[in-house]
Protein backbone atom coordinates (compact mmCIF):
# COMPACT_ATOMS: atom_id res chain seq x y z
CA UNK A 1 0.00 0.00 0.00
CA UNK A 2 1.04 3.53 -0.71
CA UNK A 3 2.04 5.81 2.19
CA UNK A 4 0.08 9.07 2.15
CA UNK A 5 0.48 12.14 4.32
CA UNK A 6 -2.70 14.03 5.20
CA UNK A 7 -2.17 17.72 6.02
CA UNK A 8 -3.91 19.33 8.95
CA UNK A 9 -4.57 22.99 9.52
CA UNK A 10 -2.10 24.38 12.08
CA UNK A 11 -3.15 23.66 15.67
CA UNK A 12 -3.15 26.79 17.85
CA UNK A 13 -3.05 26.38 21.63
CA UNK A 14 -3.08 29.33 23.99
CA UNK A 15 -1.33 28.63 27.28
CA UNK A 16 -2.75 30.54 30.21
CA UNK A 17 -1.02 31.90 33.27
CA UNK A 18 -3.53 33.13 35.79
CA UNK A 19 -6.28 34.83 33.80
CA UNK A 20 -4.08 35.90 30.89
CA UNK A 21 -2.59 34.25 27.82
CA UNK A 22 1.11 33.64 28.53
CA UNK A 23 2.00 32.04 25.20
CA UNK A 24 0.44 30.87 21.97
CA UNK A 25 1.84 27.64 20.53
CA UNK A 26 1.31 26.75 16.88
CA UNK A 27 1.91 23.14 15.85
CA UNK A 28 1.98 21.98 12.21
CA UNK A 29 1.00 18.32 11.89
CA UNK A 30 0.72 15.73 9.12
CA UNK A 31 -0.94 12.36 9.61
CA UNK A 32 0.62 9.35 7.90
CA UNK A 33 -1.67 6.61 6.66
CA UNK A 34 -1.62 3.89 4.02
CA UNK A 35 -3.82 3.87 0.94
CA UNK A 36 -6.02 6.45 -0.75
CA UNK A 37 -9.22 5.19 0.93
CA UNK A 38 -7.74 5.77 4.39
CA UNK A 39 -6.49 9.22 3.36
CA UNK A 40 -9.95 10.19 2.10
CA UNK A 41 -11.55 8.89 5.30
CA UNK A 42 -9.10 10.81 7.51
CA UNK A 43 -9.66 13.98 5.48
CA UNK A 44 -13.41 13.67 6.04
CA UNK A 45 -12.83 13.07 9.77
CA UNK A 46 -10.40 16.00 10.09
CA UNK A 47 -12.77 18.30 12.04
CA UNK A 48 -13.16 15.56 14.70
CA UNK A 49 -9.43 14.80 14.73
CA UNK A 50 -8.47 18.45 14.96
CA UNK A 51 -10.95 19.06 17.78
CA UNK A 52 -9.63 16.06 19.73
CA UNK A 53 -6.01 17.19 19.28
CA UNK A 54 -6.76 20.77 20.37
CA UNK A 55 -8.77 19.67 23.41
CA UNK A 56 -6.04 17.29 24.51
CA UNK A 57 -3.19 19.74 23.95
CA UNK A 58 -4.92 22.46 25.99
CA UNK A 59 -4.66 20.15 29.01
CA UNK A 60 -1.41 18.36 28.11
CA UNK A 61 0.92 21.18 27.03
CA UNK A 62 0.95 23.05 30.35
CA UNK A 63 1.84 19.78 32.15
CA UNK A 64 4.63 19.06 29.65
CA UNK A 65 6.05 22.56 30.00
CA UNK A 66 5.91 22.30 33.79
CA UNK A 67 8.03 19.12 33.84
CA UNK A 68 10.19 19.59 30.72
CA UNK A 69 10.42 23.41 30.57
CA UNK A 70 10.15 23.13 26.78
CA UNK A 71 7.96 21.57 24.10
CA UNK A 72 9.33 18.08 23.43
CA UNK A 73 8.46 17.17 19.83
CA UNK A 74 8.84 13.41 20.39
CA UNK A 75 6.48 13.43 23.39
CA UNK A 76 4.04 15.65 21.47
CA UNK A 77 4.08 13.26 18.50
CA UNK A 78 3.50 10.22 20.74
CA UNK A 79 0.68 11.99 22.56
CA UNK A 80 -1.12 12.91 19.32
CA UNK A 81 -0.67 9.34 18.06
CA UNK A 82 -2.44 8.01 21.18
CA UNK A 83 -5.26 10.56 20.86
CA UNK A 84 -5.67 9.74 17.15
CA UNK A 85 -5.77 5.99 17.79
CA UNK A 86 -8.36 6.41 20.55
CA UNK A 87 -10.55 8.38 18.18
CA UNK A 88 -10.04 6.49 14.90
CA UNK A 89 -8.97 3.03 16.08
CA UNK A 90 -5.61 1.31 15.75
CA UNK A 91 -3.94 0.94 12.39
CA UNK A 92 -5.55 3.83 10.52
CA UNK A 93 -3.02 6.44 11.66
CA UNK A 94 0.45 5.00 11.01
CA UNK A 95 2.39 7.97 12.33
CA UNK A 96 2.11 11.62 13.31
CA UNK A 97 4.62 14.07 11.90
CA UNK A 98 5.11 17.25 13.89
CA UNK A 99 6.68 19.53 11.32
CA UNK A 100 7.05 22.66 13.38
CA UNK A 101 6.14 24.13 16.68
CA UNK A 102 6.29 27.82 17.37
CA UNK A 103 5.83 29.33 20.81
CA UNK A 104 5.02 33.04 20.81
CA UNK A 105 4.96 34.93 24.11
CA UNK A 106 1.82 37.01 24.62
CA UNK A 107 2.04 40.76 24.43
What are these language model-derived features?
Residues 1-107:
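Flexible, low-complexity charged segments
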